[in-house]
From Swiss-Prot:
Biological role: This protein is located at the 30S-50S ribosomal subunit interface and may play a role in the structure and function of the aminoacyl-tRNA binding site.
Disulfide bond sites: none
Similarity comment: Belongs to the bacterial ribosomal protein bL19 family.
SUPFAM superfamilies listed in its UniProt record: Translation proteins SH3-like domain
Listed PANTHER family: LARGE RIBOSOMAL SUBUNIT PROTEIN BL19M, RIBOSOMAL PROTEIN L19
Organism for this UniProt entry: Xanthomonas campestris pv. campestris (strain ATCC 33913 / DSM 3586 / NCPPB 528 / LMG 568 / P 25)
Gene3D superfamilies on file: 2.30.30.790
The protein, known as: Large ribosomal subunit protein bL19
Matches recorded under Pfam families: Ribosomal_L19
Amino acid sequence: MSKLNKTILADFEAAQIQRQLPEFNQGDTVVVNVKVKEGNRERVQAYEGVVIGTKNAGLNSAFTVRKISHGFGVERVFQTHSAIIDSVEVKRRGKVRAGKLYYLRGLEGKAARIKEDLAAAAQAKAARQAAAKAE
């Protein structure tokens, strides 16, 4: 690809990346509000689970959320800059050491729990309070 095409592509991607989602990592419990179209009406559906992996690739960035629904593990891959994502809310910060948490697929019940990262949660809370004071 020529240098001109690369710069045009980079400019296009920068213009498309407008959404500012909260910072989250693997192990965090998040609620992803997804726009669902049913017939001619549109509604927002919440999908809550643990982030088991992220892929950071500019406009093609994605993250995978896993939840247990009726005893079965369900994973869903969301494109970070997709228009169907209404919002993302971080419920709980997890303390993990691995980059991808695929090992959770083989665990059940209490073994699949993730320890909470209290330091990161306190830091996020302080940042929210500082932002509220600034307004």
